[in-house]
Swiss-Prot record:
NCBIfam families (alphabetical): Glu-decarb-GAD
Organism expressing this protein natively: Shigella flexneri
SUBUNIT field: Homohexamer.
Reaction it catalyzes: L-glutamate + H(+) = 4-aminobutanoate + CO2
Residues where pyridoxal 5'-phosphate binds: S126, S127, T212, H275
Cofactor: pyridoxal 5'-phosphate
GO MF annotations in UniProt: glutamate decarboxylase activity; pyridoxal phosphate binding
Gene Ontology biological-process entries: glutamate catabolic process
Protein name: Glutamate decarboxylase alpha
Amino acid sequence: MDQKLLTDFRSELLDSRFGAKAISTIAESKRFPLHEMRDDVAFQIINDELYLDGNARQNLATFCQTWDDENVHKLMDLSINKNWIDKEEYPQSAAIDLRCVNMVADLWHAPAPKNGQAVGTNTIGSSEACMLGGMAMKWRWRKRMEAAGKPTDKPNLVCGPVQICWHKFARYWDVELREIPMRPGQLFMDPKRMIEACDENTIGVVPTFGVTYTGNYEFPQPLHDALDKFQADTGIDIDMHIDAASGGFLAPFVAPDIVWDFRLPRVKSISASGHKFGLAPLGCGWVIWRDEEALPQELVFNVDYLGGQIGTFAINFSRPAGQVIAQYYEFLRLGREGYTKVQNASYQVAAYLADEIAKQGPYEFICTGRPDEGIPAVCFKLKDGEDPGYTLYDLSERLRLRGWQVPAFTLGGEATDIVVMRIMCRRGFEMDFAELLLEDYKASLKYLSDHPKLQGIAQQNSFKHT
């Protein structure tokens, strides 16, 4: 054997990964790599790059889960090669999916299904779930208008401050979005402004049960009652879809007396994130319809796929079944009792943070993390006319130096001059961890006080309100 080949072969077998030839070059980023490399070297390169990501457990901007127990990891590993869409090939995974749909429908007080199976589907998140709910609204509205012999070319959707997915829905499906703007002192959709935006071309009204900007609930019942009066006055019947991305897996456990779900007759569909307060890993959402009549059959496809026939009304197709299976694990593992305990713990942390932060500066709280107010989030602004010598951007930047990702951002609509800070509390952010945040919060304030020349230089950062 050629001596050079022998040397190269020996090196590939025996060299430490940090002595390997492949690791001495910059990893390819613009062209498809020409040559292979050892698996341990490729892993090391990628693993090292990922250290530059933020620590997910310290990410207090995200609504998504950042803690999962070992059994979830095991179930995800077992399901990594199971395609969720292949119902015939993976019938038990499909059965688990249907069980979850029934459980979520029961949680949200959907009427008992005629055939024993609730109407709904798993999605990759609440955004896809919103798209499906919006499509069904448009189709139902169009059918009503066609039956009345009226034009269907100018549909509109009425909402308050919503996630970006509703802007996408409006653009992709050619619907006018009538978003009730945030105003100082009026940050959410109210019955009066909602009714002013409605007409016979309104396909539906979408309250956000857990507004992403602040964490507060947009309570559906007052809006629902206003739509009842609107119909009595005008004859126009308008449906509701509840975007419960966060609140859908909170209120049923910690604030069951809030009437927000299918107990309201106008609510035809509800969407939520399983991977937020549903406690599932990333990539899980749910949309449930009141009954079969609420989901137009034109949106349901029966297709041949890999030897089987399936009915599907999701936008996405192939994806792992692990997220659904992990969601089912959480439902079984915790039940109503366990979910109530976990969610209450997050609210207790939020209340503690709100109380302690209130002592640190001239703050006005928009959300204090009470179960009857919204999700377990703390959102506040500097009081009008107060100048503590720093901005919330400065504070956010200082906290980030300690690894904490606490967003400061402006509100939307007509309230863009209002800067808020928002802290999300969720499973895994326990009381002791919150105390560490407070210590760094106080240290950051002291630093800003001791270095006044640095105050006010931080710019609006890249955090998004979602």
